[in-house]
């Protein structure tokens, strides 16, 4: 018998229900120079996502007639409650930044027809302007918009014959806080969570990636199933917001 987590009607910060994402706002074309860009807000978390279209591919793909998407993720020095040095000053990219950069790239490639992109590369730069939890999920959700617009640009420039995306993609966090499962954790909730998971879904509901950790105590498989379903619902809501912004 599956363990059933207690879900009550206690409201969270900003009167959110347990299954409610934060207010999401997307501004397309925020950067006038990038082929595609989006400033995305998940509540107080804000991430600028820029997509750069470049001719050519990395050496390992040359001659294969397929394209590539890669990403870089970074946080501005004062994106959090205290200032942190830039990684360029430290002379080393943190393990966290490297991990999230790779996650964003994998998430975008999951919905890409690489052969339709031909031998071209798109670089996604995700810069966290303000962090209040969920920066990686916001970066993935916003990167899809920037990527979409960069590919539209390439098609309009007659560089590509068709749009290479096969689906949409978004991401959301879910966590066990006290006796409740919460969707889209802010920083205060994430800091107090017994367990939290970041999930990436395509618009058609297929799972791209799961990143989960029992931060303070193990959780049951039943709780995991509940968190999965809640995250899928959250990503469907994000899919609708993405579609509205592209309409």
From Swiss-Prot:
The keyword Transmembrane helix does not apply. Its EC number is 2.7.7.56. This is Ribonuclease PH. HAMAP family: RNase_PH. GO terms for molecular function: 3'-5'-RNA exonuclease activity; tRNA binding; tRNA nucleotidyltransferase activity. It is an enzyme of class 2 (transferase). Belongs to the RNase PH family. Pfam families: RNase_PH, RNase_PH_C. GO terms for biological process: rRNA catabolic process; rRNA processing; tRNA processing. NCBIfam families: RNasePH (TIGR01966). InterPro entries: ExoRNase_PH_dom1, ExoRNase_PH_dom2, ExoRNase_PH_dom2_sf, PNPase/RNase_PH_dom_sf, Ribosomal_Su5_D2-typ_SF, RNase_PH, RNase_PH_bac-type, RNase_PH_CS. Keywords: Nucleotidyltransferase, RNA-binding, rRNA processing, Transferase, tRNA processing, tRNA-binding. Gene3D superfamilies: GHMP Kinase, N-terminal domain. Phosphorolytic 3'-5' exoribonuclease that plays an important role in tRNA 3'-end maturation. Removes nucleotide residues following the 3'-CCA terminus of tRNAs; can also add nucleotides to the ends of RNA molecules by using nucleoside diphosphates as substrates, but this may not be physiologically important. Probably plays a role in initiation of 16S rRNA degradation (leading to ribosome degradation) during starvation. Phosphate binds at residues 96, 134-136. Homohexameric ring arranged as a trimer of dimers. It catalyses: tRNA(n+1) + phosphate = tRNA(n) + a ribonucleoside 5'-diphosphate.
